[in-house]
Amino acid sequence: MDVEYIIVHGTFTPAHMDVSVGDLERWHVKENGWSKVGYHRLINRGGRVESILPLDEPGIHAAGFNDRSVGIALAGGQSKFNGEAVWDFNYTPYQMAVLTRELIALKAFFPNAEVVGHRDVDDRRCPGFEVKELAKCL
């Protein structure tokens, strides 16, 4: 797979909720009817990285970009505002440190890939922060 993008996502879950691969399987496969979990990597609230899909296998995480991208999801990203769920930067320092490390490693493996947020390739707010600003520091 020719990787042109490394796309960062949030799971759009509350800060108090950690997310497992099992949760993603339930949401993506059982509830959405997808053939597999959509992301290549999950970074949980404590900063642990879970590898889900091989990097040479297309994911299901960004319509129109799946066959040329790698998807990394951070657990979290949701807060309440006036009783409504909204995107928010509520990721832990551990997650951000590990995300930075993962992005550096992936850029070494895919040097021409552009690091973006899901919001940069789709009409969404995911992951709740400007990934391109983080990418400038890599």
Features from the language model and the residues they span:
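Short, conserved "active-site rim" segments that organize catalytic pockets and cofactor/ligand binding
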Residues: M1-E57
